[in-house]
């Protein structure tokens, strides 16, 4: 991965992130002050393979770092669930 340009994309709702095929290297998640924050990412669409599914604490900013080569999204990162989350920033190559 040396020499790859890291790109960032910020989302605040469900649906395609419009990044295209990519490797997810890191996620920055800001959760709401109440509720049960949950983030679920699938490949391409809501019916695509689940690639990342995490529960988070309320009122925090969390960084999720993916080891090695990252998570490959063949089609696009699809934000399936963003319950009680203010924003999500994807770091991709």
Model-derived segments and spans:
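Surface-exposed, low-hydrophobicity beta-strand/loop segments enriched in small/polar/acidic residues
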Residues: 1-93
């Amino acid at each position: 991965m040396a020499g790859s340009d890291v790109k960032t994309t910020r989302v605040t709702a469900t649906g395609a992130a419009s990044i295209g095929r990519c490797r997810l290297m890191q996620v920055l998640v800001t959760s709401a002050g109440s509720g049960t924050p949950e983030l679920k990412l699938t490949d391409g669409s809501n019916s695509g393979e689940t690639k990342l599914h995490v529960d988070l604490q309320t009122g925090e900013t969390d960084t999720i770092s993916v080891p090695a080569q990252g998570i490959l999204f063949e089609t696009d990162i699809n934000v399936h669930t963003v319950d009680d989350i203010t924003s999500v920033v994807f770091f991709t190559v």
